[in-house]
């Protein structure tokens, strides 16, 4: 690396930029080898960047229809960059005196995503869980990867007409993952910091919490149960809070395979966040009237309805 620094030409940078595999099957993509790289080259590291994909659609591979509802999509065992492993690398990085680590490229399924999976409601739930898992692990940030060509995992697609340089662009689709991105931004707004959460359940439910600079607590509940047997409610115990407002992330029929563009039910399917939707939008603006149900606590307990295949952000102002 020092020999590269000594060349002295090209774009001036604080340190050389390298991109290495995050897959455990690669000779350089093992946890031990990556730790050795960090330790050996710490003085040259400006940013430690890894990639993550939950699944694989490359070379004809396919994932199960409900893949993004599974824990395997959150923590892919062959990716050293997975949330439940990256803490080991971050510890080595911090010991070496470096703190800037990022998931510089990630999405649901590698090689443009998978039709019927990456472009359905389950991708919104996956993104929320994945992003909050990385926040808990301590990474500085994440970059959701997208491409200009047609793909299934891109938040948006666009159409264009005309010729260079006078193209006219139009909105093609807003995919379900974008709802997850918006919900994630709500959780992290206003300099929010993570709070510890203790969850007791046998269901496929995840919980994350933050508190922002205005003293608002937000609890994210994600129910990845796939059938009505997973319907129910969550009792949240927290003292010192006011009435809670609910931002519900819902889809028609609680169907993980639905989107704003499917017709799995009569009249078509719709995703809503806080009662609003992008379905029918021609310019990217959200449609409909916002609806935020209120939950009044009983003592220190809040009862939050949580149907299967859904998520909700519970906002509670602290007194």
Predicted stretch roles:
Residues 241-302, 306:
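Acidic, Ser/Thr/Pro-rich beta/coil linker or hinge segments at domain junctions
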Residues 46, 132, 140, 217, ...:
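Residue-level detector of short, conserved catalytic/binding motifs and their immediate flanks
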Residues 52-54, 107-108, 148-149, 223-226, ...:
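Glycine-rich beta-alpha junction loops
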Residues 49, 103, 143, 218-221:
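Structured core elements
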Residues 201-242, 246-256, 309-312:
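Carbohydrate-binding surface patches
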Residues 1-130, 137:
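Noncatalytic carbohydrate-binding groove/subsite architecture in carbohydrate-active enzymes
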Residues 103, 107-207, 213-214:
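Aromatic/acidic polysaccharide-binding cleft in carbohydrate-active enzymes
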Residues 300-318:
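Extended hydrophobic packing segments that form well-structured cores
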């Amino acid at each position: 690396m020092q020999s590269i620094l000594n060349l002295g030409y090209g774009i001036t940078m604080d340190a050389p930029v390298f991109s290495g595999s995050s897959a455990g099957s690669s000779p350089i993509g093992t946890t031990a080898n990556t730790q050795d790289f960090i330790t050996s080259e710490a003085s040259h590291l400006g940013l430690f960047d890894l990639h993550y994909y939950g699944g694989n659609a490359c070379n004809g591979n396919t994932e199960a229809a409900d893949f993004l509802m599974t824990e395997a999509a959150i923590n892919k065992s062959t990716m050293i960059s997975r949330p439940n492993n990256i803490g080991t690398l971050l510890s080595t990085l911090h010991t070496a005196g470096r703190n800037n680590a990022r998931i510089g490229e990630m999405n649901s399924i590698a090689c443009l995503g998978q039709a019927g999976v990456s472009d359905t409601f389950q991708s919104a739930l996956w993104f929320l869980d994945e992003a909050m898992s990385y926040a808990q692990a301590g990474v500085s940030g994440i970059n959701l990867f997208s491409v200009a060509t047609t793909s299934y995992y891109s938040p948006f697609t666009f159409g264009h007409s005309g010729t260079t340089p006078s193209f006219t662009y139009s909105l093609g689709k807003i995919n379900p993952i974008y709802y997850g991105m918006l919900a994630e931004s709500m959780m992290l707004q206003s300099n929010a910091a993570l709070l510890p959460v203790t969850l007791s359940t046998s269901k496929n439910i995840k919980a994350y919490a933050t508190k922002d600079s205005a003293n608002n607590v937000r609890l994210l509940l994600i129910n990845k149960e796939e059938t009505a047997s997973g319907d129910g409610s969550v009792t949240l115990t927290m003292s010192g809070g006011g009435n809670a407002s609910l931002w519900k992330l819902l889809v028609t029929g609680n169907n993980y395979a639905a989107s704003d563009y499917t017709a799995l039910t009569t009249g078509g399917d719709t995703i809503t966040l806080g009662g609003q939707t992008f379905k029918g939008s021609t310019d990217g603006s959200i449609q409909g009237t916002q609806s935020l149900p209120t939950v009044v606590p009983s003592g220190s307990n809040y009862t939050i309805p949580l149907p299967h295949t859904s998520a909700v952000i519970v906002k509670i102002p602290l007194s």
